[in-house]
Amino acid sequence: MPLVAATRSLGRAGLFSLTVLRGSTPTADFLAELTREIYKIGARSLPIIAVGGAFVGLVLTLQGYRTLTTFGAADALSTLLGLSLYRELAPVLTALLFIGRAGSSIAAELGLMRATDQIKALELMAIDPVAKAVAPRFWAAVLTVPLLTGVFCSLAITASYFEAVHVLGLDNGVFWSALRNSVDFWDDFGVAMLKSAIFGGTAALVASYVGFHAEPTIEGTSVATTRAVVNASLLVLIFNFVLSAMLFQ
């Protein structure tokens, strides 16, 4: 039955997550692998995050300015930008871009390890494959996605500033003062970082679980990669709603 299968999969995913946490022992090998994964899934995601952030800022500024000028409230443009970015758009869009760039890579790598019997080889050598191959990827995602969200916000606000002030003619002081007065460090920026850490961990766990349990074939790896991106993206959107409902009451 579909319900039984879904419940079984959910239970396996929960046990897999506990295994990842249990295997997160900060040994020298673990820290070395963690550093490599931070570079692979974090630093290499910077270009797409930077470009995405800049163009989201430009689009928000353009559409927001047109809407606000209708009501004579163009001075509130940076308020709209800051609150929408930090509270919702930046964490979610960064996570979705991260899933497309790094989540698919994690699922494909682990699926290929399954297809080429590398996971079995680790088990035969009495090495926990989850601790070796999954835990560093999980913690790398938890650490890097908040940093990527910060980059996304910085580029979005910078691009918005240049468009609003130098193209649309908004006053420089008004832009920055409205942004400073509307965005709270803990309530807005802190929530963005919290969301990003949760989204990063969710993306890594889903991609790792699906890739780790993929069919040991090339087709199975392809299916697992697609499933990882879809499932992780849906969970990020669901968790974002739940967190927003809890944190912004």
Please describe what each predicted stretch is.
Residues 110-135, 218-221:
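Short cytoplasmic-facing helical segments at TM-TM junctions of multi-pass membrane proteins
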Residues 25-51, 230-233:
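Membrane-interface helix starts
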Residues 63-86, 154-197, 201, 205-224, ...:
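Membrane-interfacial helix-loop-helix connectors in multipass membrane proteins
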Residues 221, 227-244:
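Final/C-terminal transmembrane alpha-helix of multipass membrane proteins
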Residues 2-32, 210-211, 215:
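Short, membrane-interfacial amphipathic segments enriched in basic
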Residues 40, 44, 48, 52, ...:
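Loop-to-helix entry region at the N-terminal start of transmembrane alpha-helices
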Residues 128-149, 224:
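Start (N-cap) of specific transmembrane helices in multi-pass transporter permeases
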Residues 48-63, 242:
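Hydrophobic alpha-helical transmembrane segments of multi-pass membrane transport/permease proteins
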